């Protein structure tokens, strides 16, 4: 089975240079507390439930051939283990309260979709960004097929990655992708495990590999009070020291937001980021100046 795509976002302006199409692949090895695309974490299809649209008529409960839908205390619930994605509940829901995320493409069909906006790429210096989930933790024959076909058509290819994938995957893609948008969240390993569920050893190793191979790298840092932002800028200073020896084109500082919070209800999952906060504008400017003082081309935002 080919990797699943949860969204092909057209006219994106925050995922690399110019106007771009961003392909969001499904499946990620990290579980970041602040993740704004929680439906992208699993590698399988999922049914999303929009409670605001649901009239509680219970037609879906009665019609589901696999008995996967049941009435909970306050809303209609779904047993994902029983669901076979037959779409019967979608067909019978007059309010469109359910949708399935995760669509399979062939390499050729996906590139055809990407190519539809080619005129915008050419006019703006844009292209396609392969994102996720985690694009580098997918079937790499498929991903390399997409990259190579796009490159053969003159389409600029960026890779948006959290860095947590096999090192050989990065070695394989380093010479054919035009740009890596590489997330660095924390240098402190214990904190990284606490907030993402995984060690950062592999992430820090892979960005060094890309640098050694001469890849074009833009570092992207989500800035979150209580995670990697504090009064003394301790974690930020660690990041700067780590990045100094590397071949880095630019640094993007991404202030925390919770605009994806509503998605958690749709997959029957609790949002664990309630206590997280966005840094003040003054703190963002302070951190920006720290990076600039070490000669990094730095901006706030994507």
Curated annotation (Swiss-Prot):
InterPro entries: 4Fe4S_Fe-S-bd, 4Fe4S_Fe_S_CS, Aldolase_TIM, BssD/PflA/YjjW, Organic_radical-activating, Organic_radical_activase, Radical_activat_CS, rSAM
PANTHER family: PYRUVATE FORMATE-LYASE 2-ACTIVATING ENZYME (PTHR30352:SF4), PYRUVATE FORMATE-LYASE-ACTIVATING ENZYME (PTHR30352)
Summary of the function given for this chain in its UniProt record: Catalyzes activation of the trans-4-hydroxy-L-proline dehydratase under anaerobic conditions by generation of an organic free radical on a glycine residue, via a homolytic cleavage of S-adenosyl-L-methionine (SAM). Is involved in the anaerobic degradation of 4-hydroxyproline.
Name of the featured protein: Trans-4-hydroxy-L-proline dehydratase activating enzyme
Binding site for S-adenosyl-L-methionine: 34-36, 133, 183-185, 257
Domain 4Fe-4S ferredoxin-type positions: 45-74, 75-103
One of the Pfam families matching this protein, by short name: Radical_SAM
Coiled-coil boundaries: none
Residues given in the record as [4Fe-4S] cluster 1 binding sites: 28, 32, 35
Chain sites annotated for binding [4Fe-4S] cluster 2: 54, 57, 60, 93
Free-text remark on how the cofactor is bound: Binds 2 [4Fe-4S] cluster. One cluster is coordinated with 3 cysteines and an exchangeable S-adenosyl-L-methionine.
Enzyme class: oxidoreductase
